Amino acid sequence: MWCLLVLLCSQEIAFSSGFTTTSTLNSDKSQYRKTRNPECFMNVSEVIRYHGYPSEEYQVTTEDGYILGVFRIPAGRNSQNTGQKPVVFLQHAFLGDATHWISNLPNNSLGFLLADAGYDVWMGNSRGNTWSLKHKTLNPSQKAFWQFSFDEMGKYDIPAELYFIMNKTGQKDVYYVGHSEGTTTGFIAFSTYPELAKRVKMFCALGPVTTCPHATSPLIKITNVPETLLRLVLGSKGAMHQIGFLKGPVTQLCTSLDKFCGHVLCYIAGGNVKNLNTSRIDTYVGHSPAGTSVQNIIHWHQLTHADQFQAYDYGSKENMKKYNQSTPPAYQIEKISTPTAVWSGGHDKFADPKDMAKLLPRITNLIYHEHFPAWGHLDFIWGLDATERMYQKIIELITKYF
């Protein structure tokens, strides 16, 4: 859920350190000879092609008018097979984007591994992030553009993307892999639309988050303030987007002080820096945070205090108008019959094991669950051992349920 706020914090702390620790940096001039990874400044398609894979990009329009950037890896690096293949859809976490799945080298990035394993890989982008800032009638300068949270992402974005992909490929069904908020939107979409859920052959949930009262990240504590104060500080439009003029200094600093930036990530998200490829951290911060709406941030803030997985709380008066009841309705996860596999981490500061224990019994068709005691929230997408411990199992399960 909140995991990519980690990267924002990393940028702010590291950038500040660059001006207050000059003597430290100068003490080892060899640091400056480190070269940034070129992917820092590439878009999604460029990253894919840089590693030798074919790339396609599309714009998908939702029922409520948002235009989403969707990226495709139609074949593996050395594959000559251009025919139909099973489709795997990957949905990123809060404040993330499609680059999450291709940020490491090909042998450690799920998007590339799936393509090499013979799958047609599609990567979504939530409304309001770097690649989904368009609308049929609105623009990002308008407050109305930003009136959404993960509720709308689940009810509009995910269905639009999946149906577009099935129509484009001719496939009758897809496999869905989500991380953090990407699982949240999956749970909403599949519980809201049973017919869509029937066309999802398997749902792989990595570090899933539905409620988070036990989240231990210091970032949660920082934002644990009254909702009115959050609105006063953040405003009412978008937040946490990339700041153009900071991208160069931040990526350079996280190249020179890669372990420092890695420790910041782990301090906030959990896990151990030894399981991160610190030579890639400049790439991570080069694309994140990718932005979202303040309303989405508020919705997550509400779930840190809620005892159930529920829709956005507008207040009793507005709730009556929107939901015909004074409180937000709960999402009915139990209605989902899709085969679901879950991976969780013991040191995950956002998807805490206590909250996971509450979620798992609600998953009606839980076909697999694996818990990694040492993993934090970022290990699912960037862990050095993720290929061996999880990605290979995902491919194995997808093959089994083909």
Task: List where the protein language model places each region.
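Cleavable N-terminal signal peptides of Sec/SRP-targeted secreted and luminal proteins
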Residues: M1-G18
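Alpha/beta-hydrolase-fold enzymes
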Residues: F15-L25, N167-K172, E181-K321
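Short, surface-exposed "cap/lid" segments of acyl-processing enzymes
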Residues: T62, I67, F71-L138
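Conserved alpha/beta-hydrolase "nucleophile elbow" surrounding the catalytic nucleophile
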Residues: H92-F94, V174-T183, G345
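Alpha/beta-hydrolase active-site loop
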Residues: A144-K168
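Short beta-strand/loop motif that positions the catalytic acidic residue
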Residues: I336, V342-S344, D348
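Short alpha-helix in the alpha/beta-hydrolase fold that links the catalytic acid
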Residues: T338, D352-P361
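Catalytic active-site module of serine/aspartate enzymes centered on a nucleophile-bearing elbow/loop
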Residues: Y368-F402
